[in-house]
Every structure is written in structure tokens, then in C-alpha cells.
Amino acid sequence: YYTVTGRQRNDLVVFDPATMREEVLLKDVPEGYFAWSPAEDYLIYSPDDKGEAVGGPLKRLLHPDDRIPDARSRNYLVRYDPVTGLSERLTYGSHAVYLNDISSDGKKLLCSTSKSNITQCPFSLTSIFELDLATLQADTLVAWDPYVNRAAYSPDGGQLLVIGSPMAFDGIGKNCGEHPIANDFDTQAFIVDKATKKVNPITRDFNPAVDFLQWNRVDGCIYFNTTDEDCRHIYRYVPKTESFEMLPLQEDVISSFDLAEYNPAVAAYVGGGNASVGVAYT
């Protein structure tokens, strides 16, 4: 899917790689980043509200980031119904809200929001919450942790895969001996049980830094792109055995990797190495 400029707003175009045909699926959809629901019955958009304009010779800085242009702009979430063409704003407030994931049944959104904390490193706090689309009730799952980044649902929705620093969840992912400060660039993954709030630091003893790709619905494995010394390898984590497996791909530096949600035997990726760059594979 991709968008093109239409008469008023954007047109949503679908491209079929098998036939190389393009078709306009929806016309005059809202502008901005969007994500489909699993059943493709609605879209979630993320437009932004421009912050308060300040005129005159003086400007009050609300926080250090307020020196940056558009720092007062706030992203919010909108549900768009492609059948009726109606949009419903879902989030409000003084903090930007970002979509992290949509539950498999399409009934709930996993979102994150951040705020400044100028008195303590790393100078910001992040919360992860769940939004029920039927009631618009929000349930906070991770409350103002300075070291978490984003999260995703497990296929059954009972667990979360949270990405963050080793210092997240009171440092449960630290593996640096007696050194008091962990390397925040050594990104870790944590499985959080929604019911019990138990946190499992699955990558604490796994050497590469990880970047979450997908929790597959069929094989139940979690796929990561990793920074593995001077390589970018794709690994999968098998929850049943609590083990990691490196996928035997053709290149050592994988720049992008996409796996079919309902057929994990099918994937497409782009990578390079000593004698190649930007090579696509399926």
C-alpha cells in the first residue's frame, strides 16, 4: 500500500507484485502516517496539532527541547472508517501519543507517550498504555519508565514485547557486572505478562543489540534485526525453548527484513556485504 496526492487529500493505492498492477483502493483519505487494522476494516492515522505560536521579543522555554522548532507540536491518533469516510479522534492531551501496535482482534491499540524529566538522566519518561476502541478507556501497562522505547502485542494479546535500555524495569536487563551504568545503545527486549506484570529480560545474556521486527502469529517466534559487531544479522527467539537462532541469509548486513505474518517460511529482505550492496532477496 502507498498514498498519492489526490484531488483533495490523498488516494490510497494497492500494488499487486504478482500482476504488477496498481489500483486506487480509497480516495480522499487523511494525510499522514497510517496503519491498517488486522481485518482491514479501519485505519489508524497519526496527524499532529501545531503547538502554541509565540510572538514578540520574548519566548518562555517550557523545557530544553522547546528551543527546537515545532517542539510544541503533538501527534494524536485518529480512527478512519473507509466505508463511511468518517474520522474519529481517539487521543487528546498535552503529550504526543504514538501507535505501537494493534491487537490481533482489532479491538485494542497499544500506544506510548513521553514527557520531559529535566532533573534526571535520560531526561524523559515513557508510558505504554492500552486503548479499548469500544469504550475509549485507557489502561496503563508501563508507567513512566525512563528507559523503555516501544512495545508490541504477542499473537494472543496476553503478553507484550517491550524494547528498551538494559536499565528498563529497574535495571532487570543489566549485564555489566559491578559497573553502575549500562550501555543504553545496547537495546534489549523484555516479555511482559499483562496479567501478572512479570518481566522476563530475554536478551540479557544475548550479546547483539536488538531491533524488534515481528512476533509471528503462526510459529510463535519473535524476529529481531541485530547489531552483531560489524554485522546486521536476523535472529529469531523461540519462547518455548528460550533460545535464539540466526537465520542463514545471503548477506552479512541486512538493512530490511519482512516476514509473512501467516507463513513464516516466506520472507523478503535487502542486504549487502563485502562484494555487494542493496541486494534484494525472497
Regions found by a protein language model. Name each.
Residues 35, 101, 152, 214-216, ...:
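Conserved beta-strand position repeated across blades of beta-propeller domains
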Residues 1, 43, 109, 157-160, ...:
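Hydrophobic beta-strand positions that form the internal "hydrophobic ladder"
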